[in-house]
Regions:
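Glycine-rich phosphate- or other oxyanion-binding loops that anchor nucleotides, phosphorylated ligands
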Residues: 1-159
């Protein structure tokens, strides 16, 4: 990003990695706060966060209000538990980096401590060429669109 801020509230939506073992794939996270791995914290816009939560409830979706971590890299293995112990429920790679007057987020857990993604998926064309990733590829093809659709439905209902 060029360092300039967006003029309004930006809504970050999409997939997240679950950090806590009690959060299955499909868990909706609508956080009050987001932080980066270096400790930079961002409080989410209260009005839009409330709108997203109300929308989730109207749709009959359960959600959690827990801190979201933004990381430069996939968080796997023992690092998941370490960040969970610090109070974070899920991790993405975008939200805390958004520069806007305000942000709000709706993220849906895809990978979990019980079902970690291979770091190969940071380069999907490379990951798909490795037979060890084919099982994950099929799982991702099924679950990623389903989870992304949940986030999209919440945003659509909040607008």
């Amino acid at each position: 990003m060029n360092g300039r801020s967006l003029p309004g509230v930006a809504i970050s939506a999409g997939l997240a990695g679950g950090l806590r073992s009690d959060l299955p794939t499909g868990t909706i996270v609508i956080p009050s706060a987001v932080a980066t791995t270096d400790g930079t914290a961002v409080v989410c816009d209260a009005v839009w966060t409330a709108r997203l939560r109300d929308a989730a409830q109207r749709l009959g979706y359960a959600y959690i209000d827990a801190a979201l971590l933004t990381s430069d890299a996939l968080v796997v293995g023992d690092a998941r538990a370490a960040w969970a112990a610090r109070g974070f429920a899920a991790v993405d790679m975008e939200t805390a980096r958004i520069r806007a007057r305000g942000i709000a987020a709706v993220r849906v857990v895809l990978d979990t401590p019980q079902r970690e993604l291979s770091p190969d998926w940071l380069n999907p064309s490379r990951a798909m060429r490795k037979p060890k990733n084919w099982g994950q590829m099929l799982w991702l093809a099924r679950e990623a669109p389903r989870c992304a659709d949940l986030a999209a439905r919440v945003i659509a209902a909040a607008l």
